[in-house]
Structures are given as C-alpha cells and as structure tokens.
Regions:
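Non-globular, low-confidence helical/coil segments that flank catalytic cores
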Residues: 1-241
Length: 241
C-alpha cells in the first residue's frame, strides 16, 4: 500500500486433501481471510491483484476476492492457464476487469515493480512471477514458487545484491533458495510463508541453514509479518498466529 494505491501479490488458499489423489487439484477451501485482512489495514480497493502462478495455495481465494472486493486489474504469470486461472479469467470478463499476462513492469505512483520473467519454462513453479521492487533504497524480492533453475537464470541476467526483504521461494522447499542464489542477493530479512505442521515439512532444515546469515521470519511461528517504510526506516511488525 502506497499513497492510497494498493497492490496484492497472491491471495492464499488452502487445498483440501480429503479426497482421492486424482481429485486433490479440484477441491479447495475458500475463505474470507484475505478480505478481512485487507479491510483491517484500511484497504477497501485493490488497484492491482498479482498472481505469482496458478497454484491453489497462491491464488485459491482470488475468485472470492474478485466477487466481493473492488479490484481494478489482475496480472497473471507467463505460461499456459490452468483450470483455476481460466475460471478466474471468465469471472474477470463478466465483470469487465482488465487482465494482463507475462508483463515486464508495473507502476506504483511513480515507482516500478519489475517482473523478472526470463522465459517460459516447462513447469508452473519456474513460471512464477518473480517481482523486484525498490523504494527509498529498500529492495524487495518476491520469489513465488520459483525454483533453483530460475534463481540461477535471474542472477545471470539481473544485477541483484543486498536485498533488504526476500519472500523466500516455495515456502522453504529445498527445490528453491540455493546457496549460490542467497550468497549473491545477500538478503537482510527473509520471509517464509508456511503453515504450521504442514505435510511437506517446510521449511527444510537445509534452507534454514542457507539463510543462517539472514533474519528469518516464518508465518507458522511469527504469524502475520508486516514491513512498513516510514521516514527512511524499515519497520517490522508481527502478529502471532
């Protein structure tokens, strides 16, 4: 949120695993948690909703959000649409909401969010929108579920160093957050979005070890983590889960 303009990256959403394996991708929970949180911090409209990619845990609440909240436009990642994304696009068409795919940058009151989209990959995770944002000399990097291959490609193409806040890729899975990548970007703070006692064992110990020189915040332990820039200072607030 900046000067009455608000951008949301991903909505969250919980996948249900209470059915046969072949049905798992078609069942998910919809809640109002995203809308409740946005209203609690004074946001009543989104200028842009960005989905990093089409997994339920990243955009499972998107349709509910669009149907019950004011959203001006939606940005999708590179690659082909899955069923969840296609359903959302149909809703956007009905509501005459603009949507864009595989963009390079987005303006926020004179500041730019850069989308580090190298190429189209053959897997959804590496097709994640990776977003770099710099404001008042503070650097933010949001990795979606991008894996080690894309991390390497990003380092080879972009001059990234001394990142202030890293949104760690793929919830702390060992398919992301390589030592090579972390040594290059040297994040001061690292945020891991992860559920308590999750079935995948995220974050992995190897990833936590790779991030040993970074200040790590985890949503399963720290709850909601908020970064605010005030008078050229970066403030951190947490709300226990």
């Amino acid at each position: 949120k900046y000067k009455n303009e608000a951008i949301l990256i991903d909505t969250g959403g919980k996948v249900s695993f209470k059915t046969e394996k072949w049905k798992q991708k078609t069942k998910y929970y919809i809640t109002d948690s995203t809308i409740v949180f946005l209203k609690s911090i004074g946001i009543t409209k989104l200028n842009t909703l960005i989905t990093t990619h089409g997994d339920y845990d990243h955009m499972g609440e998107a349709s509910n959000l669009i149907n019950n909240f004011k959203v001006d436009k939606v940005v999708f990642n590179c690659g082909t649409y899955n069923d969840l994304e296609s359903n959302l696009i149909n809703i956007l068409k009905v509501k005459n909401i603009d949507n864009y795919t595989c963009i390079k940058e987005l303006s926020l009151k004179g500041h730019k969010l850069n989308f580090l989209n190298i190429k189209e990959y053959d897997n959804e995770n590496d097709n994640s929108n990776v977003i770099y944002f710099k404001y008042n000399n503070f650097k933010f990097l949001f990795m979606g579920d991008a894996g080690i291959t894309k991390e390497k490609n990003i380092i080879e193409k972009y001059n990234l160093s001394n990142i202030d806040v890293l949104k760690v890729g793929h919830h702390g899975s060992d398919t992301s957050t390589s030592e090579y990548f972390i040594n290059k970007i040297n994040p001061k703070y690292s945020i891991i979005s992860v559920g308590k006692n999750n079935r995948y064992g995220h974050p992995k110990e190897s990833v936590l070890n790779t991030l040993k020189n970074s200040n790590v915040y985890r949503t399963d332990k720290n709850g909601t983590v908020m970064f605010k820039i005030k008078k050229d200072k970066l403030q951190i607030e947490t709300c226990s889960p």
